[in-house]
Amino acid sequence: SWIVLDNNKANLARGTRVIWEKIDRADFKLNKINTNSILKNIDMHLGLVFHRFLEGINLKREKLKIFINGSEVEPKNPFNEESNATIKSAISTLKYNNSDIFVQYFILPHEDMVSIEEWKNFEGEGGYIKNQGCYVYRCNRLIVSSTWFGIMPKLASTKLCRAKIDIGNDIDSDWKIDIKKSTASPPKSIKNFLTELIINNIERKGRGVVNKRTQELIQDKDLKLWV
């Protein structure tokens, strides 16, 4: 049965309240620390999956606001696009069955090029090595994150590499998108393009940023030994 509750956000002219009860495998009764950890993970997940809606960028609508227990969810853009130290490629437009697919890659700044806070903000749950890879957006909602689609393994030397892929809702079957909109696999022609892009551009530039900084540190250390 449905239960209608008064919205305690009296200043909101309109909105939607989502009430989750009896969540499978989530035991909020254990202790406060466990509950806070679960809520933090939910906040991070929603902030990442819906970050474009929360940012309100390039959308033909006002930006979305999500509250968890009264606290507003902040967008978790994984690409650090505002940093001058981030390497950003041009946007590639691919035609597939009369549908446009947009691809852009980013090499995030080395740890020594940003503040500790900024480094942590874009690390993501599990760290940089885990969160490298492609991020697929379907109509601006993130449906797949941090995967190279089997094209290459996740290595420390490419931990700063991320790519965003935008697709519409008219090629779901081609991308093998499931009913939950939580998995996707690129068609062969698109994967061939991604393979060439990842191997010849993304991997090479990502390794270059990491290796260059490592070499600089080695040289600095050698110089100091001679002082």
What is the predicted role of each segment?
Residues 1-58, 62-68:
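GHKL-type ATPase core
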Residues 5-6, 21, 67-69, 76, ...:
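A structural detector for beta-sheet-dominated domains
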Residues 21-27, 75, 169-177:
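Short acidic (Asp/Glu) and glycine-rich catalytic loops that position anionic groups and cofactors
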Residues 44-59, 80-84, 116-128:
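Short linear motifs in intrinsically disordered
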Residues 51-98:
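Accessory nucleic acid-recognition modules appended to NTPase machines
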